[in-house]
């Protein structure tokens, strides 16, 4: 008898701070389903969603909130990094000095270009995908604690995420 096994990648999705380094090929990330943050009135709060899935997966994004009705989703596209920054020049190649402070050795790809999602659906191109969420915080919103519920369907799996925002006055 011949046994064939198909290895399928697990699927997951969670919040990620916009300052976290996220790559299309590999990451050592957690996928928190609940995230709390502080923000100010009259700004736009940004948070990322990291999707871990098979390539060509379908991700459908939805949210519910009484206070926030203009949330936008943006797919963050990856670009190549071909050379590392040099210690005393634009790249290491100019003088040949290796920069020990880089977070990853080139060549690799990194997320950088933001593309608006018009119908709240994307199809993934790599095992990790990055979705930027922009939440306008109105200047007349009361300083308080708010919650936004996200329902995300990744292929046939449903994920429920909660973003807790503490909105503050800026004086």
Residue positions per predicted region:
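Beta-strand-rich extracellular modules
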Residues: 151-155
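An acidic-aromatic substrate-binding cleft motif
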Residues: 160-171
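Short edge beta-strand/loop segments characteristic of extracellular beta-sandwich folds
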Residues: 46-52, 134-136
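Surface-exposed binding patches on compact interaction domains or structured appendages
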Residues: 12-31, 54-133, 141
């Amino acid at each position: 008898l011949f046994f064939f096994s198909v290895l399928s990648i697990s699927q997951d999705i969670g919040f990620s701070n916009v300052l976290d380094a996220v790559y299309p090929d590999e990451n050592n990330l957690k996928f928190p389903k609940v995230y709390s943050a502080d923000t100010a009135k009259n700004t736009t709060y940004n948070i990322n969603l990291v999707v871990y899935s098979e390539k060509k997966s379908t991700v459908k994004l939805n949210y519910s909130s009484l206070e926030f009705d203009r949330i936008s989703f943006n797919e963050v596209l990856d670009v190549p990094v071909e050379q590392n920054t040099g210690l005393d020049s634009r790249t290491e190649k100019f003088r040949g000095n290796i920069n020990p402070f880089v977070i990853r050795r080139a060549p690799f790809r990194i997320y950088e270009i933001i593309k608006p999602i018009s119908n709240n659906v994307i199809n993934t191109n790599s095992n990790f995908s990055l979705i930027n969420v922009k939440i306008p915080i109105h200047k007349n919103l009361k300083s308080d604690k708010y919650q936004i519920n996200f329902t995300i369907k990744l292929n046939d799996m449903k994920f429920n995420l909660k973003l807790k925002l503490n909105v503050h006055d800026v004086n």
